[in-house]
């Protein structure tokens, strides 16, 4: 039951998007591609036993700011620390790239995400 966090593709992220009911009527491969455009971006995936169970996507807003845009964890992999591992991997990559700020938005309808952000010292 080893969890592997690695750079992935939008197609891999979409495997999780389609399994998360909170994202119903949400993003498609085309909409995600358009959002990223030619911006400097990072697509992380969490892989467990060969299956993609989580993702985190972000992109550059400006030379100092990276925006953590979209992420999720498949229902069967929740409460296993997947979101925390993805967040830590993204933070490490953002720091290595020299960004000064990591910006994120969330909504009250995603209380688990709000708790994760608060636990990690984010201002919301």
Region spans (language model):
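Conserved beta-strand in the GNAT
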Residues: 45, 51-59, 66-72
